[in-house]
From Swiss-Prot:
Source superkingdom: Eukaryota
Gene Ontology, cellular component aspect: membrane
Species name: Arabidopsis thaliana (Mouse-ear cress)
Keywords: Membrane, Phosphoprotein, Transmembrane, Transmembrane helix, Transport
Protein name: Probable metal-nicotianamine transporter YSL8
Predominant place of localization: membrane
GO molecular function: oligopeptide transmembrane transporter activity
Location(s) in or outside the cell: Membrane
Region (Disordered): 1-58, 386-407
Pfam family, one: OPT
Membrane topology: Multi-pass membrane protein
UniProt function note: May be involved in the transport of nicotianamine-chelated metals.
Family statement drawn from the similarity comment of this UniProt entry: Belongs to the YSL (TC 2.A.67.2) family.
Length: 724
């Protein structure tokens, strides 16, 4: 007898064989049954036939599912470590340039499949292959890589952690309120202390989230379908073609970055300072900077995000900032530096902050309402079904009854394997308590402003917020980790107060909260992927833990490389301005200081944009999907407010390329667009490693390509002729 029972196809074959043995034609018997059947039974049989054709697990039924220990292979973690370094560089670069980070799940799954498939093929030819490459192992790699590179975001290297530094404090003009400059030792220790709690907080709820509530987790589901498709014969062929395309554009992007480097010998030199629309437009950051990374990001991000970014850039740098600049000497002092928080920079930062907070608050409330209404519906539904069974005097409904929900073969098999390897609740609760105790003891020594009782309060509420974030992400595919972090900034910062280091306490609390809720939603997303690929929950948990540990080591080292290689890291007009670091410090400053330090009419404009962000979201939801998808996103519109629209132009170029490609050849665009985009992002992202090494070694580019107006060029020529 085979394991796992009979597949629908096998059941049908046995039934037809038995009918033939009795001399009855299966087709005639099926026709008789169809005539005598009720409409509902005919519908059931039709659904059964469709299920037999569409069953995913039916395809893999003959393949043995490895035990959870065999899913965790050495080769999987070697490949994961290599890919985590690659993706950490990519995420770090995006984090320190614009803060816009697209989903890299597809790239991680595709590259993981390619590397291990190549490895196993070589071993197979040499006769040393002991274990074939399975979709479960592919899922382990995907989970580990995403967990590791996720630390590059939740670790705060472009937000709360870098916001503590002297470099960002100088721009905000509040050095006296406390600084803590980056150091490799304390950053690694901090991440190890705070990054694992979220994993333990949601482990006991995995069955409720995945099986009982059947939350969709769109990203996790899409990743699982991708991995399942890789391991079918047709999917493997397509994956090879996709990897080939990715490799071509990776090479192009890498060598394009290398070529551009030769022309960047000075400030504002090179192709990334090309005045595409003229020098006047360039002054207000309207130009195409030839960034392969953001062209690729534009191909991945939805059209509405790219359009929203461009609209935000036009509204701010094309209209608002030139108008406010004319009020110099009236609304703010005329003698302040352009980067001073007492001048125009304050309007750029705080209006963006107000818009982000308005958008975040609206979506926070919306997701919470959906979360609690969904929970109430689930609880009522279960209570109703139990009471109806308890009081029902009639015999149970037949399998054909519409009262009994049908469970597909795929769901039966997936549920059986998902519940097979349990993670004990005592282990999860005990782990949370132990790590909380260690963290509460260590963190006050790292941040003297962060008192032990602040940390205990955070850890009491964190599991509730982690559950809310994980449930909300399951419904909407939207993690609100940064919003919960901002909530911690304001609450802990205000509690500590300005005179007791509230600014640093708020930023540190943000890091604690953000890491907990972010890893919690990531793990439940991975549980969904594991459920759909028959990967063991234990394997998913161990992979997430190992990936998180990798991230706690790799991400600080990558950031440290950037920090040491680029002296202007974090400055407004540099290659890596780290815009959200300024935003987070400004939020912390607001939390402890209030709004009294803002320039004239800045507060009024903040109120207006806060309200407009909520109103736009309300209009978007009221219009529904048909028309609401054309309404811009306030969060995306706010990012260019202090950064400029140049990267939005890059992303719109990516959108335009994708749009034209879809019109010319939609099937190929659907199959290869993500591979092209991933190649562009990965190649340019990995170029930052050699460029950082060259900068640390003191190797300078040989040429400065700079653009001047005719009048300035004439003066320069005259000066050079005079000096000669």
């Amino acid at each position: 007898m085979r394991k796992g029972g009979l597949t629908p196809d096998r059941d049908r074959q046995i039934e037809e064989h038995e009918l033939q043995e009795t001399g009855i034609s299966p087709d005639i018997e099926r026709l008789k049954r169809n005539i005598n059947a009720t409409p509902y039974q005919r519908e059931e049989e039709e659904e059964d036939r469709e299920e037999q054709e569409e069953s995913v697990e039916g395809i893999f039924e003959s393949r043995e599912v490895p035990s959870w220990k065999k899913q965790l292979t050495i080769r999987a973690f070697v490949v994961s470590f290599a890919l985590s370094i690659l993706f950490s560089f990519i995420v770090m670069k995006l984090n320190l340039t614009t803060g816009i980070i697209p989903s890299l799940n597809v790239s991680a799954g595709l590259l993981g499949f390619f590397f291990v498939k190549t490895w196993t093929k070589m071993l197979h030819k040499s006769g040393l292959l002991k274990q074939p490459f399975t979709r479960q192992e592919n899922t382990v790699i995907q989970t580990c890589v995403v967990a590791s590179s996720g630390i590059a975001f939740s670790g705060g290297f472009g937000t709360y952690l870098f916001a503590m530094s002297h470099r960002i404090a100088d721009q905000s003009g509040d050095v006296a309120r406390g600084v803590k400059d980056p150091s490799l030792g304390w950053m690694i220790a901090f991440l190890f202390v705070v990054s694992f709690l979220g994993l333990f907080s949601v482990v006991p709820l995995r069955k409720i989230m995945i099986i009982d509530f059947k939350l969709p987790y769109p990203s996790g589901t899409a990743t699982a379908h991708l991995i399942n498709s890789f391991h079918t014969p047709q999917g493997a062929k397509l994956a090879k073609k996709q990897v080939r395309v990715l490799g071509k554009f990776f090479s192009f992007s890498f060598f394009w970055g290398f070529f551009q480097w030769f022309f960047t010998a000075g400030e504002n030199c090179g192709f990334n300072s090309f005045p595409t629309f003229g020098l006047r437009a360039y002054q207000y950051k309207f130009y195409f900077d030839f960034s392969a990374t953001y062209v690729g990001v534009g191909m991945i991000c939805p059209y509405i995000i790219n359009i929203s970014l461009l609209l935000g850039g036009i509204l701010s740098w094309g209209l608002m900032w030139p108008l406010i600049e004319t009020r110099k000497g009236d609304w703010f002092p005329s003698n302040v530096d352009s980067s001073s928080m007492n001048g125009l920079q304050a309007y750029k930062v705080f209006i963006a902050v107000a818009t982000i907070l308005g958008d975040g608050l609206y979506n926070f409330c919306k997701v919470l309402i959906r979360t609690f209404s969904g929970l109430i519906s689930q609880i009522r539904g279960k209570a109703g079904s139990r009471s109806s069974l308890a009081h029902k005097e009639d015999p149970p409904a037949s399998p054909a009854s519409p009262l009994t929900p049908r469970i597909s073969y795929d769901d039966q098999r997936r549920t059986r394997f998902f519940l097979k390897d349990q993670i004990p609740s005592w282990f999860a609760v005990g782990g949370y308590v132990v790590i909380s105790a260690v963290s509460t003891a260590i963190l006050p020594h790292m941040f003297s402003q962060l008192r032990w009782y602040y940390i205990i309060v955070i850890y009491i509420f964190a599991p509730i917020l982690a559950f809310c974030n994980a449930y909300g992400a399951g419904l909407t595919d939207w993690s609100l980790a940064s919003t919960y972090g901002k909530l911690a900034i304001f609450t802990i910062g205000a509690w500590a107060g300005s005179d007791h280091g509230g600014l640093l306490a708020g930023l540190a609390a943000c890091g604690v909260m953000m890491n907990i809720v972010s890893t919690a939603s990531d793990l439940t997303q991975d549980f969904k992927t594991g459920y759909l690929t028959l990967s063991s929950p234990r394997a998913m948990f161990v992979s997430q833990v190992i990936g998180t540990a990798m991230g706690c080591l790799v991400s600080p080292c990558v950031f440290w490389l950037f920090y040491k290689a680029f002296d202007d890291l974090g400055l407004p007009n540099s290659e890596y301005p780290a815009p959200f670091a300024t935003v987070y410090r400004s939020m912390a400053k607001l939390g402890v200081e209030g709004v009294s330090s803002l320039p004239r009419d800045c507060l009024m404009l903040c109120y207006v944009f806060f309200g407009v962000a909520i109103l736009i979201n309300l209009i978007k939801d009221c219009l529904g999907n048909r028309w609401g998808r054309f309404v811009p996103l306030p969060m995306a519109m706010a990012i260019p407010f202090f950064l400029g629209p140049y990267f939005a132009i890059d992303m719109c170029v990516g959108s335009f390329i994708l749009f034209v490609w879809e019109r010319l050849d939609a099937p190929k665009a659907e199959a290869f667009a993500t591979a092209v985009a991933s190649g562009l992002i990965c190649g340019d992202g990995i170029w930052t490693l050699p460029s950082s090494v060259l900068a640390i070694a003191g190797v300078k580019p040989p040429i400065c390509m700079k653009f001047l107006s005719a009048a300035t060029n004439h003066r320069v020529d005259k000066f050079l002729q005079g000096s000669s």
